[in-house]
Design a protein with these regions (language model features):
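Membrane-embedded alpha-helical bundles of multi-pass transporters/translocases
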Residues: 2-467
Length: 468
C-alpha cells in the first residue's frame, strides 16, 4: 500500500476540484429557490417543476458521460482531462443561470429552463470525471477517507467564501438592482471556481488502472454494473443522503428572513457559521473512522441527526444566540457522513471489480451523480411545492402563520425524517472494514498477475518479431 499514499499537496489539489464545483453548485443549493422566486420572479411551484424536469434529461446524459470518461485515453489519463476541457463552460453557464433578462414572463421561464439545463449538462461533464478521480488516485481505504476529508474541508472553505461574499457582493454590485448584483457576484465566484478546477488538474495523478480495460458497448456496461448489488444500494443511499441537507439549505434563507425576521447581513453570518461547522464535521470523519467502521459511524450519526433536527421545530426562533449555537452543532453532525459517503462509493467500485472482474468507474459514478442530482431536484421541488402549499407569497410584506409553519417544517422536521430514512438505508450496505481488507488484497494480487501476464505476452511478441 506504500505506493497508494497521497501527499498533502495532492489531497489539497483534489479538494480544490470539488471546491471549484461547489462554489458554483453551492450557490444553487443555498440560493436557487430564493433567487428564482424573489429575484427572477418565478412562481414557487414552477421552480419545483423546473428542478425536477431537467433530471429526466440527466437520466440520458449521465450514463453517456460515464461511458465517455471510462473510454477516454489521453496522456493525462481517463478522468483528469475533463477538468481542463469543461472548467470554462461550467463557469460560463453558471453566470448565465444567475442572469435575469428583462423579458416577458413566458420568455423568462424558457430562459430559466434552458440555462439551468446547460449548467446541469456541464456539471455532469465535469463532476462525473472528478468524482471518479477519487477512486483511481489510491486503493487504500484509509487514504480514501483522508482524501475525502481534505476534499470536504476545501468544499467548506469554498462554501464559506460563497456564503460570506455572494450576498454582500450582490448588494455592492447591484445596489437596488438585485438581479444585476447576483449576476456580477456569480461572475466573480465562477472565475474563482474555474481556477480551482485548473489547480486540481495540475496537481492530481491517476494511479489505479483496471486489470482489464473496457471496450464493450454502453449497453453492456450498463448491464454489467447492475450485477454489483452494493452499487444498487449505494444509489439509494445517495438519493436519501442528499435530501435532508439540501431541504434545510434551501429553506435557510426563508427561515432567517421570515421566521427569525433577520436581514441579509445576518443571513450571511448565519450561513457562514453553519459552513464552519461543516468543515469541522469533515475533519472529524477521519478521526472517527480511524477507530470505528465507517458504516457504523454513518448509521449512528444519522440517528442523532434525526432527533436533533426534529427538536429544532420546538426551539424559539427569536432566541437568536441559541438558534445559532444549535445550527452550528447541527452542521458539524450533518457533515460527518459526507466524506464517508464518497469513500464508500470508491469501496463499492472496488467491490464491483472484485465480484465481476470488470471495473467501470465512470458508469458507476455517473449513476451516483444522477441519483445525487435527483435527490437535489426532489428536495428543491419539495421546498417549492410545500411553500406554495402553505401559501408562501414572495411579494408579501409579511407571511401568513401557515406559510411560516411550512418554512419551519422544511427547516427541521422534514430533514429529520430524511436522516432517519438514510440511517435505515446504511444498514443495507455490507462493504465494512473486514470485507474491504479482503477485497483490496485480492484485487492487488489480480492486478499484479495481469500485469505479469501482459509483460510475458509482450516479451513473446517481441521475440517472435525478431525471429521473423
Amino acid at each position: 500500500m506504500a505506493d497508494n499514499r497521497l501527499s498533502i499537496k495532492e489531497k489539497i489539489g483534489y479538494g480544490m476540484g470539488d471546491a471549484g464545483c461547489n462554489i458554483i453548485i453551492g450557490a444553487i443549493m443555498l440560493f436557487v429557490n430564493y433567487f428564482y422566486t424573489d429575484i427572477f420572479g418565478l412562481a414557487p411551484a414552477l421552480v419545483g417543476v423546473l428542478l425536477l424536469s431537467v433530471r429526466v434529461i440527466d437520466a440520458v446524459t449521465d450514463p453517456i458521460m460515464g461511458a465517455l470518461a471510462d473510454r477516454t485515453r489521453s496522456k493525462y489519463g481517463r478522468f483528469r482531462p475533463w477538468l481542463l476541457w469543461i472548467a470554462f463552460p461550467y463557469a460560463l453557464f453558471s453566470v448565465l443561470m444567475f442572469t435575469t433578462p428583462e423579458w416577458t414572463y413566458n420568455s423568462k421561464v424558457i430562459y430559466a429552463f434552458v440555462t439551468y439545463f446547460l449548467l446541469s449538462v456541464t456539471y455532469t461533464a465535469i463532476n462525473i470525471p472528478y468524482c471518479s478521480l477519487g477512486t483511481v488516485m489510491t486503493a487504500d481505504p484509509k487514504e480514501r477517507v483522508a482524501c475525502q476529508s481534505y476534499r470536504f474541508v476545501m468544499v467548506g472553505i469554498a462554501t464559506l467564501l460563497l456564503s460570506l461574499t455572494l450576498l454582500p457582493m450582490a448588494d455592492w454590485f447591484g445596489g437596488a438592482d438585485k438581479a444585476k448584483g447576483y449576476q456580477m457576484a456569480m461572475t466573480v465566484l465562477a472565475f474563482i471556481g474555474m481556477c480551482m478546477f485548473l489547480f486540481c488538474f495540475a496537481t492530481v495523478r491517476e494511479r489505479i488502472h483496471p486489470a482489464v480495460q473496457t471496450n464493450d458497448e454502453l449497453k453492456k456496461d450498463l448491464k454489467d454494473v447492475w450485477k454489483n448489488d452494493q452499487w444498487v444500494r449505494i444509489l439509494l443511499l445517495t438519493l436519501c443522503n442528499v435530501c435532508p441537507g439540501f431541504i434545510r439549505m434551501a429553506a435557510t434563507m426563508y427561515y432567517v428572513t421570515w421566521v427569525m425576521g433577520q436581514s441579509t447581513h445576518f443571513a450571511t453570518l448565519f450561513i457562514s457559521l453553519g459552513v464552519v461547522g461543516m468543515m469541522i464535521g469533515s475533519m472529524l470523519a477521519k478521526v472517527l473512522t480511524d477507530r470505528w467502521c465507517k458504516l457504523q459511524v454513518f448509521f449512528w450519526t444519522n440517528i442523532v441527526l434525526a432527533i436533533f433536527s426534529c427538536a429544532f421545530y420546538f426551539f424559539n426562533p427569536h432566541a437568536t444566540t441559541l438558534i445559532m449555537v444549535l445550527y452550528f452543532l447541527l452542521n458539524i453532525l450533518h457533515q460527518i457522513p459526507s466524506p464517508l459517503h464518497w469513500s464508500l462509493m470508491s469501496d463499492v467500485d472496488d467491490y464491483g471489480e472484485w465480484k465481476t472482474g470488470k471495473r467501470i468507474t465512470g458508469i458507476s459514478f455517473s449513476g451516483n451523480l444522477f441519483f445525487l442530482k435527483v435527490g437535489l431536484a426532489v428536495a428543491g421541488a419539495m421546498v417549492g411545492f410545500l411553500l406554495s402549499w402553505y401559501g408562501y407569497d414572495a411579494g408579501a410584506k409579511a407571511q401568513s402563520a401557515s406559510a411560516l409553519n411550512g418554512i419551519v417544517l422544511l427547516f427541521s422536521v422534514i430533514p429529520g425524517v430524511g436522516y432517519l430514512i438514510t440511517a435505515g438505508v446504511v444498514r443495507l450496505l455490507k462493504v465494512d472494514r473486514t470485507l474491504m481488507r479482503q477485497i483490496q488484497s485480492d484485487l492487488e494480487k489480480r492486478r499484479s498477475n495481469y500485469s505479469e501476464l501482459n509483460e510475458y505476452q509482450e516479451l513473446k511478441t517481441s521475440e517472435h518479431v525478431r525471429k521473423a
